[in-house]
Amino acid sequence: MRLILPADTEGIFLERKSRFTGVALVEGKKTLIHIHNTGRLPLLKKGKRVLLKRAESDRRKTGWDLLAVEHRDEFVFVHSGFHSIVAGKILEELFPGSTIESEKRFENSRFDFLIDRRTFVEVKGCTYEEDGVAMFPDAPTERGRRHIEELISSVKSGFKALLLILVFLESDCFLPNRSVDPAFSRVFWRALKSGVNIDVFRVKYDGEYLCSTEKLSICEEV
């Protein structure tokens, strides 16, 4: 998978003002930027280089969208608004020739995709790691837990189900973040035992392209 998404400029992150806004030094000026990610994003720290895209509308209070933040030797893509686009491209490669529909409802949830009317797909983006282990979530997520429970329910109803996890930073393998959200971790392992397929893909960003480079394994839980 390769998706062109060039950043328009680079800045220096200064602070997070609220859930969706932050301040960065852009072209020598303190500028309000939009953060399209509801996670805690612990890697978003003062002084980090960030990649930004100019907002399409000049009516917005925030003139720039945050795309990626510097972390070690790479830029980590953090704009969750592109998760479905990236996932859709990956699914086209995983299921060539299949009918892929987006935003399909099952019981009390709306899943990201439905493939050939028989496989529900939910997508999660991961921007957190510890000691080479990618972890999701970085903040408690009742919504995320509910989505996985509904995937389990869809399998019991005769459908197939896939949890597609996109890991945006260098990692060796993936685990649910038990210390941050024990309930999510429990339902993750229950989903595996219940027949939900879980695929984890590493996605890199170089300021120009988003590329899916490899499939990651699920770590052994300690």
UniProtKB/Swiss-Prot annotation:
GO terms for molecular function: DNA binding. Disulfide bonds: none annotated. InterPro entries: SfsA, SfsA_C, SfsA_N. It comes from the Bacteria. Transmembrane segments: none annotated. Belongs to the SfsA family. NCBIfam families: sfsA. This is Sugar fermentation stimulation protein homolog. It comes from Thermotoga sp. (strain RQ2). The gene is sfsA.
